């Protein structure tokens, strides 16, 4: 029997960065709530360009460790959790197969998220990876991860189980 899908790491932007894409794993629980029209859904996180990122429909970004591992092999370099600017690095869940409107419950404290859209890469993402043509390469691979909106606020921490409760 396969392990249950789970959160491998919760990643927050490095304080004082020019953009919010430089995210690093954090320890302990992080509060997640609907941010309104701008900002991140995770307490302590930041968004660099509020015109393109954040807000209720992009409150949380999830990306699978399995996809990071595939990119590691393709690019020939280590890709730590958070490198793609994801708030949640997951394991055991095909994030790319998630459907718009699909709902996930994380952990046991009632955090409920809804898949709102796939990621569309931006120039900052390409600059972060320092791979020429990265936006086109990433888009063509069709492994965008998922943006999520917050339906019910609650904490999230590394190790939390992810349950798909509505598809």
Label every PLM stretch briefly.
Residues 25, 140-144:
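Short, ordered beta-strand-loop transition motifs
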Residues 128-140:
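Short beta-strand-turn/beta-hairpin segments enriched in glycine/proline and small hydrophobics
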Residues 1-126, 133:
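Electropositive, beta-rich accessory/interaction domains or terminal extensions
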Residues 158-167:
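A hydrophobic, small-residue-rich beta->alpha segment in the mid-to-C-terminal subdomain
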Residues 90-92, 145-152:
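Short alpha-helix capping/helix-loop boundary micro-motifs
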Residues 118, 151-153, 167:
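An acidic- and aromatic-residue-enriched active-site/binding cleft used to recognize and process polar
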Residues 101, 153, 157-159:
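Loop/turn positions that initiate beta-strands
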Residues 106, 149-150, 160-161:
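A general structural signal for short secondary-structure boundary/capping elements
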């Amino acid at each position: 029997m396969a392990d249950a899908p789970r959160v491998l790491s919760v990643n927050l932007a490095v304080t004082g960065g020019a953009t919010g894409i430089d995210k690093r794993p954090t320890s302990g629980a992080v509060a997640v709530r609907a941010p309104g029209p701008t900002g991140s859904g995770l307490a302590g996180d930041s968004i660099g360009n509020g015109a393109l990122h954040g807000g209720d429909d992009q409150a949380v970004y999830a990306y699978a460790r399995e996809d990071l591992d595939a990119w590691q092999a393709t690019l020939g370099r280590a890709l730590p959790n958070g490198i793609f600017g994801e708030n949640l690095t997951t394991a055991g869940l095909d994030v790319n197969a998630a459907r718009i409107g699909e709902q996930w419950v994380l952990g046991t404290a009632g955090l409920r998220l809804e898949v709102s859209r796939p990621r569309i890469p931006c120039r900052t993402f390409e600059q972060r990876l320092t791979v020429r043509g990265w936006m086109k390469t990433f888009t063509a691979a069709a492994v965008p991860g998922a943006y999520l909106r917050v339906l019910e606020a609650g904490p999230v921490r590394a190790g939390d189980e992810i349950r798909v409760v509505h598809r």
